[in-house]
Amino acid sequence: MDEQNLVTAQENASLAADKVKRVIPNYLLEKEGRLVEWYGRLKGNPRTKLLMLYGFIDEIYKAVSVLTPCKKGCTSCCHIPVSISEVEIEVIERGTGTRRNKNISHPSNYHGRPCPFLLNNACSIYTHRPFVCRRHVVLTKTSHWCNPNLANTAKFPLLKFSEVERVFQAILWEAKAKPMDIRQAFGN
């Protein structure tokens, strides 16, 4: 199980990827298959729709949590770029009372810099975290390759649900949202 060995880590991730559909309850897989249709029937503003999508994502990823090292206290992904949109900024502001910076900073290379919401090795806005944080789940047995110094040095299968992605993109389009890094909106 020594996942410092790249081949071992990739094999473990591939095995876990093969198990994903077996650990997710059928009703969730069926709902994911009809998610775009579900989105078409939703009423409300983009923020309301995003919150509903977050609820679904949380259900699906809860089922997959047995296959991933992603747990509270692992902060590797909190040190890579975190893309957010205006509608996600609104979710964070309304959910936490934290206000965005008055002046949005210029884009920068945020790789290796901690997320402004990382406090005591935990996400302080976990319930209101952005989409990218919800869906960024690795399938290796350990978080060794998640370290920002190793991230992007090797390829691993990542969890991805096509209908979830389509609905998220539709919400962004509806909100006319432009992406930025979370550190631009909320960093010092």
What feature does the model see in each segment?
Residues 1-76, 80-188:
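Short loop/turn segments that flank or connect secondary-structure elements
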